């Protein structure tokens, strides 16, 4: 249990620092699209797909490595990678409508919650 916690902790720290560094370098490059955020989301999706493919074939590897890379590193880099993997699993299972629903709910839900949180802060500050 302790090794699992440490793996997630270390991987998460590494992913978070990388996300920050990439965002600091790339976001100022374009005023319309946060390129750093896009880059880490795409990178995270690629890494988690690569990791799952590798770990499914190399079953002798210690599961702690999977935790470090997927839950820790990719989770720290972006939660978008986990979402992407879940959609891929739904598509692989032939559950296309559920994959679409999952995509729409995650994207729209996240945007709505972000907007609601922003509006709440504006409302509280206006009181």
UniProtKB/Swiss-Prot annotation:
Catalytic activity: fluoride(in) = fluoride(out)
Residues where Na(+) binds: 75, 78
Signal sequence segment: none
Keywords: Cell inner membrane, Cell membrane, Ion channel, Ion transport, Membrane, Metal-binding, Sodium, Transmembrane, Transmembrane helix, Transport
Regulation: Na(+) is not transported, but it plays an essential structural role and its presence is essential for fluoride channel function.
GO cellular component terms listed in the entry, alphabetical order: plasma membrane
Superkingdom per UniProt: Bacteria
Subcellular location per the Swiss-Prot or TrEMBL entry: Cell inner membrane
Transmembrane stretches, start-end: 2-22, 35-55, 68-88, 104-124
Membrane topology: Multi-pass membrane protein
An example Gene Ontology molecular-function term: fluoride channel activity
A Pfam family matched in the record: CRCB
HAMAP family assigned: FluC
NCBIfam families reported for this sequence: crcB, PRK14196.1
Function: Fluoride-specific ion channel. Important for reducing fluoride concentration in the cell, thus reducing its toxicity.
Family designation: Belongs to the fluoride channel Fluc/FEX (TC 1.A.43) family.
UniProt-recorded name of the protein: Fluoride-specific ion channel FluC
């Amino acid at each position: 249990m302790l090794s699992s916690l440490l793996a997630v902790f270390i991987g998460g720290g590494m992913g978070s620092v990388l996300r920050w560094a990439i965002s600091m370098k790339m976001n100022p490059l374009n005023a319309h699209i946060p390129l750093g955020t896009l880059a880490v989301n795409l990178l995270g999706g690629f890494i988690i797909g690569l990791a799952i493919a590798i770990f499914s074939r190399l079953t002798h590897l210690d599961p702690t490595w999977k935790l470090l890379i997927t839950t820790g590193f990719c989770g720290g880099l972006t939660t978008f990678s986990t979402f992407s993997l879940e959609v891929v699993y739904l598509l692989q299972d032939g559950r296309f409508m559920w994959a679409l629903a999952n995509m729409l709910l995650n994207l729209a839900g996240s945007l709505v919650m972000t907007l609601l949180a922003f509006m709440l802060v504006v409302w509280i500050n206006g009181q």
